[in-house]
Amino acid sequence: MWRPGRTIQAAPGPFSVRKASEVSDLAAASRVIADAHGTAADLVERVFGLAEWRAGSIECWLAIDGDDAASVAWLTFGEGLVGVWEMMTSPRHRRRGAARAALSGGLAASRGRAPGGAFLWASPMGAPLYGALGFQTVEPVVPYVRGGTLEELALIGASPA
């Protein structure tokens, strides 16, 4: 999906949004990912380049509910564009605006770094949110998976074989 380089406002709501600036913020992001997908709690440290995060070519934006990280948006930058690398929301915070808060807050704050626009690949579950934030489908993505429960397949828009 593609979003032209125009201004976006941070979404109002019950969540505070902040850019990850400490290693403890990355640990909070890892917990969101682990909650969302049942992965290892140290996933961020193993998958994302911490050197790139420290250098600023990767940004991590957190939507916070009290002391609890609810959603995370990872943004990458290059050639005047921003790529939405990954979005995750803890299941207990879904359908409350956490993902909208994290993504809109990150995009609003990074506008000067990405005047050309933003792009992402959307799952069927995330596409309605991205459309509401001004992203347009360039070409539909067809997910191919092996296995999974009926519920998991439905979440990504795949049909059982």
Which ranges hold each PLM region?
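Acyl-donor-binding surface of acyltransferase catalytic domains
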Residues: 1-24, 120-122, 142-146
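An amphipathic alpha-helix signature
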Residues: 26-31
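Actinobacteria-biased recognition of intrinsically disordered, low-complexity terminal regions
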Residues: 153-161
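Helix-loop element at the rim of GNAT/NAT acetyltransferase active sites that forms part
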Residues: 32-43
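Conserved acetyl-CoA-binding loop-helix of GNAT-fold acetyltransferases
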Residues: 86-91, 95-110, 132
